[in-house]
Amino acid sequence: MLKNQIDIQLSTKRKEKPSFSDLKFGKTYTDHMFIMDYSREKGWHDPRIVPYQPITLDPAATIFHYGQTIFEGLKAYVSENEEVFLFRPDENIKRQNRSSVRMCIPEVDEDLALEALKKLVSIDRDWIPNQEGMSLYIRPFIISTEPNLDVTPSQTYKFMIIMSPVGSFYKEGMNPVKIAVENEYVRAVRGGTGNAKTAGNYAGAMIVQEIASAEGYSQVLWLDGKENKYIEEVGSMNVFFKINGEVVTPALSGSILEGITRKSVIELLKHWGVPVSERRISIDELHVAYQKGQLEEAFGSGTAAVISPIGELSWKNEKMVINNGETGELSLKVYKALTGIQTGKEEDPFGWRVKVE
């Protein structure tokens, strides 16, 4: 499909923009959205940018009953020179297609998806906040739309992209968060859908998040679903620990989402010559390191928060206070490097930044 086939219908009535200084994450949406349809007969067809609007679905659409859906998340940034950038959008598109394969959804042409992203961001570029720590959050997603109660893959789909100006994901910002280690529920198991960005993974975690929030924690640290001892993710983020000078992050096991920020952090650390390893790490090993005074820092990484320092881990009846509950030096360095590249303040030796004309 040719990129110039994207039809553009501009809104004749633009929305009133909110105060960017008081944004709630994911509550406000831009003037336009991207939509493309799929059918077995036509494949993906009719790519278009239209005014932001509701969509109509049959009550029997398979998305409502069997959750055949995937989504992505990335951001657009504006520089001090008013240039607009995306951060590694090609990686998001590739991951979207990997998730699609796992959920039996047809893949989208990567070049077309990137062009759709660029055009949509370009049209709504004045929605990108230019304040420190703010950005335009972009949510591509695919839903199954065929009216069919049989448990079979849908024969029709919609691929859509919506966008939302956002501030910090956590109210704490770059201040350390408190995390509860989850010992009862699990997020995913090997061979399941843990490495796909699909809705059910997040819905199934909500009860645990609600319990943790009620007890004063920002997120939960998930353990593996088989032995309930190996660390996997923290909330909706990948997780890193600095132990005795080495940075350790759980190896991708098939039940952990392949985070793009995670990948970027690892590449940054290697570029700086910081020892980093991807391996299995148990909560017991982490606890021993803490008791020995070797657990120097911990942080989560993800698109929404970028880097979120962890100041406290609650496990069983013990609270592990990390780095005196303060933001670690390495956490801050990684955050500044990533956001500097994303916003054009720093050089980009990796070619991660993609300019939007």
Which residues does each predicted region cover?
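Intrinsically disordered, low-complexity, positively charged segments
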Residues: 2-58
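Conserved catalytic-core subdomain
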Residues: 2-20, 28, 171, 179, ...
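Extended Lys/Arg-rich, glycine-bearing segments that form polyanion-binding/interaction patches
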Residues: 2-3, 22, 89-92, 97, ...
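Active-site-adjacent loop/helix segments that line or gate small-molecule/cofactor pockets in enzymes
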Residues: 27-35, 49, 62, 176-223, ...
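Short acidic-glycine loop/turn motifs at beta-strand connectors
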Residues: 35-44, 70, 77-82, 89, ...
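Conserved phosphate/anionic-ligand binding catalytic regions in large, soluble enzymes, centered on
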Residues: 58-75, 304-308
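Flexible, glycine/charged-enriched surface loops at secondary-structure junctions
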Residues: 109-111, 127-135, 220-223, 273-283, ...
